[in-house]
Structures are given as structure tokens and as C-alpha cells.
């Protein structure tokens, strides 16, 4: 694949995108007008056509803070719910990492500009897992799970997002900052469920730990394997967990941790599960493992209904991104290619090469949204690799 990368990049720059036969806007519109194509199918195929024609543009990073160095390499990015803020983890040459928030409202303008706020430098500490947390309001905090080091124990830390953005007239004051001492965590998830209000979960070695932030109360659920991926369902009282053994199981939050009645749905992969995404209705789940297998599960029938082919993963913790509004699944492989599939049908819509040669140290981190930059934003993909940000907007 690396030998094909320069040619693919050149074709993308020249906007020479090839789509499936019949997948062009005039043809689809004509079929819809003649009644040969139902409106729902027309909308779905139109979205897929736009995804296959995404165009790459470099994003200009304009810093308000001298400490936000543009030379720091992106390690991970994580967009909030509205996709108007981007939490970033940047690798520092001297050791350790910088954590910060980028305002993305500038993505709605033709210039494609973003603005980093002040950063927090943490020397010699590694974050194994992170997610946005809605403590005071939607995405008010960041939940970071730090690995222990020497005499410094591992912990889960809730950082208010306002800590990074700073103080401006009319802005909220920094919210609650708190830390919980826990064993080294492989994964974490914040609950939006009424059955675990103001709570988060951490996936540990052969254990799931559920913590209430307000009361400090903790519940432990024993497992037979390390828990590498987690997500709370919103519509149902379940916490889903993906394990190193390949098992996926749900914890019924109504049952407590006594006995074995808390273990609900059980599914299985052939390798370690690295990512879980529950669809909004709570009836379907997308999961991936360390063999590159990505599956869509029907949770009511407890069976796989769709498989997404082409993802490359041999040993890494790589996330899978699901956007139901656009009807797509996106994932970056160890080969540094970003692939986007149709959520419903599973066929590959587009393959995006990295702007840089493939390397284990240069695997892109991406975010996909229907509204990049906020409410008035356009659909597309945001990619962070090395020191650069790229936006792949719909054509």
C-alpha cells in the first residue's frame, strides 16, 4: 500500500475521484424523479457519493498562547459532542505530553483556521485512556486515566475544559477538578445514563470499576480478562465491555455487583477487542479487534449482521468512529490509511492515504462529524498527523 500512497495523494489533489458506476449526482436525481429510486435510498446514496469525493485541505493553526507550540507532534485528538472543540494530546521532545483544547469554529470559514488555547504540560506521565465527561453540563470535563510511575500511583483525573480555555468575560469559572486513585486502567467511559448518573467506568486488569464522582462510591465487577474498551448505553441500563480475550459483555447497572446476575449480553471476537461504539437506539453495536475485524452486532439477536472489510490492525489499540447521521464507519489502520465504510451495507466508500509515509509513530488520529466546527459546520473528517491538521470536506 505504501507504494501506492504518492499516486493516491496526487489523484486526490487533482480531484480525480472514481466512484461506482451509476453513483453520480445527475443519474441518481433522474432515477429519483422517475420513481426508480426511493427517496430514502436516494439520500443514503447521495451521502455515500459525497464521502467518496472528500477533498483534503490543510488547516492553519493560529495560537493565542505562546506555550502552544506548533512544533509538538499530535498523539491523539478527541472531538466533543458538538465538534466545536478538540482535545489534543501532543508529544513533547523533552519527554511527557502536552494537553490542550483547540477551538474549531474557524473550520466553517474558507480559510480553515483553528485556535489552540493554553496547554497543560505533564512530564513523564502516560495517559492510557481518555474521554469527554458531562459533569456540570455537556462535555464540561475531560476524564484522563494516568498510568502509575515509580512512587506516583495511577489515577483517574477529571479536568474542567474551562481550565484550558482560560478566563474571558461571560465565561463559566473552572469547574470541579478531582482525582481518584485507581489501578492502571486500560479504558474508561463516562455515563450519560440515568442508571449511573455522574459516574464513570474504568476497565482494569480482570476488573471493571464503576465510580460515582459526587459520592465517591465505587462498585467492582470481576472479569476473566483485561477490559480494553468500554461504553455506556444511553437508552438501556447497560455498560458494554470489550476484553483482551475477545469477549464482549454487558453489565446490567440495575443489579449491583452481588452474584452473577449483573452479566447481560455476551458476544465474541477471535482477538482482543479494542473499540466499542453503541448506536443511538441501543439495539446495535460496532466493535473492532486486533486482527482488523470490524463488526456490526444486532444486540437483540446477539449476532453479527455486517462486517467491514479492509481494516489493518495487528497489535494496536485503534478506535473506530461511527456517525449515524451520515451513515458511515471510519477507522485508521496500522498501515496509516483511513477507511470509511457504509454503516448499513458495509461496503468500502473511500480509502484516504496519510500525507506522510506509513510509520508506527505516525498513525493519524481522526474525528468524523456531520458538523465540523459546530452547528453551522459542514460534514467531513479531521485528521491529525505529526504537527499538522487536515480537513477532508465533502465535495
Swiss-Prot record:
SUPFAM superfamilies: WD40 repeat-like
Keywords tagged on the record: Repeat, WD repeat
Pfam families attached to this UniProt entry: Beta-prop_DCAF4 (PF23761)
Transmembrane spans: none
N-terminal signal peptide: none
WD repeat ranges per the UniProt record: 268-307, 312-351
Cellular component GO terms held in the UniProt record: Cul4-RING E3 ubiquitin ligase complex
Protein's recorded name: DDB1- and CUL4-associated factor 4-like protein 2
The organism of origin for this protein: Homo sapiens (Human)
Source species taxonomy: Eukaryota, Metazoa, Chordata, Craniata, Vertebrata
Recorded name of the encoding gene: DCAF4L2
Amino acid at each position: 500500500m505504501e507504494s501506492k500512497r504518492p499516486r493516491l495523494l496526487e489523484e486526490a489533489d487533482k480531484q480525480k475521484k472514481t466512484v461506482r458506476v451509476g453513483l453520480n449526482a445527475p443519474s441518481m436525481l433522474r432515477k429519483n424523479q422517475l420513481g426508480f429510486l426511493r427517496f430514502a435510498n436516494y439520500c443514503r446514496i447521495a451521502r455515500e457519493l459525497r464521502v467518496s469525493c472528500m477533498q483534503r485541505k490543510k488547516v492553519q493553526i493560529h495560537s493565542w498562547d505562546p506555550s502552544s507550540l506548533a512544533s509538538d507532534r499530535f498523539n491523539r485528538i478527541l472531538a466533543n459532542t458538538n465538534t466545536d472543540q478538540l482535545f489534543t494530546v501532543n508529544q513533547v521532545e523533552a519527554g511527557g505530553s502536552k494537553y490542550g483544547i483547540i477551538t474549531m469554529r474557524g473550520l466553517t470559514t474558507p480559510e480553515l483556521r483553528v485556535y489552540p488555547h493554553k496547554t497543560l504540560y505533564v512530564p513523564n506521565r502516560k495517559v492510557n485512556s481518555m474521554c469527554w465527561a458531562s459533569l456540570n453540563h455537556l462535555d464540561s470535563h475531560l476524564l484522563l486515566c494516568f498510568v502509575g510511575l515509580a512512587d506516583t500511583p495511577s489515577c483517574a483525573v477529571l479536568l474542567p475544559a474551562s481550565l484550558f480555555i482560560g478566563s474571558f468575560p461571560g465565561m463559566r469559572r473552572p469547574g470541579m477538578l478531582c482525582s481518584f486513585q485507581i489501578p492502571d486502567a486500560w479504558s474508561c467511559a463516562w455515563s450519560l445514563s440515568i442508571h449511573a448518573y455522574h459516574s464513570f467506568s474504568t476497565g482494569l486488569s480482570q476488573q471493571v470499576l464503576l465510580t460515582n464522582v459526587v459520592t465517591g462510591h465505587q462498585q467492582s465487577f470481576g472479569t476473566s480478562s483485561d477490559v480494553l474498551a468500554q461504553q455506556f448505553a444511553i437508552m438501556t441500563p447497560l455498560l458494554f465491555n470489550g476484553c483482551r480475550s475477545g469477549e464482549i459483555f454487558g453489565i446490567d447497572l440495575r443489579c449491583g455487583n452481588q452474584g452473577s446476575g449483573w452479566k447481560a449480553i455476551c458476544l465474541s471476537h477471535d482477538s482482543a477487542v479494542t473499540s466499542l461504539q453503541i448506536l443511538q437506539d441501543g439495539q446495535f453495536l460496532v466493535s473492532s479487534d486486533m486482527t482488523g475485524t470490524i463488526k456490526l452486532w444486532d444486540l437483540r439477536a446477539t449476532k453479527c449482521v455486517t462486517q467491514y472489510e479492509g481494516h489493518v490492525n495487528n497489535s494496536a489499540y485503534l478506535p473506530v468512529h461511527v456517525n449515524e447521521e451520515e451513515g458511515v464507519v471510519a477507522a485508521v489502520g496500522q498501515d496509516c490509511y483511513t477507511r470509511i465504510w457504509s454503516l448499513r451495507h458495509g461496503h468500502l466508500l473511500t480509502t484516504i492515504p496519510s500525507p506522510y509515509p506509513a510509520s508506527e509513530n505516525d498513525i493519524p488520529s481522526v474525528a468524523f462529524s456531520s458538523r465540523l466546527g459546530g452547528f453551522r459546520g459542514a460534514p467531513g473528517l479531521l485528521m491529525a498527523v505529526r504537527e499538522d491538521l487536515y480537513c477532508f470536506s465533502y465535495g
